[in-house]
Amino acid sequence: MITLFNATMSRSTRVLWLLEELGADYELVPVSIRRPDGSGGADPANPHPLAQVPCILDDGELIVESLAIWVHLADSFPEARLAPGLGHPRRAEYVGWLGLATCVFEPLVIAALAGAPTDERQQAARSYLAQRLSAALDRHDWLLWDRFSAVDLIYGSLLRFAPDALGPLPQIDAWLYRMSERPALARVRQQEGRT
């Protein structure tokens, strides 16, 4: 069984959403984390070496960091069809989308939430991301292909925190609406006490 060390309204929320989409059996262990506003703090119940989330235990194996957790979980549940498997012709594209989300897009979202000024490099990255997501959504209802995938979930989870991070784009607004209607997300909201 998978154990998710969960701090409500944090990066672990997206892992909870992924677990729900996968139909996985899991246990939630609530933990406290240091919040950007200075509240909270390290929790001895959290095995993450930096006392952060996300963090899971899967059959006794500690896995930290969103990208590693994403690849591990989506690969562990191939029947959910949320990711192309090893050897699939779109595998590299899938992993590239995930890397772009965690290494480029997430820092932009964090900076936007903090109200930090945008430099030229960040603006170029934001423009590239907006163009790439819009182009993908011009082809399909979802980012990677014609059905929901783990790629949609990671980008959607970031845009739920900062919906204007890429500017107003009709394709992205419609895509976010489709995601907001997913039953797995409704279950996550209920678990976290949100509607």
PLM regions with names:
Residues W97-P183, V188:
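GST-like fold's C-terminal all-alpha helical module
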Residues M1-R121:
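GST-like domain detector, emphasizing the conserved glutathione-binding G-site
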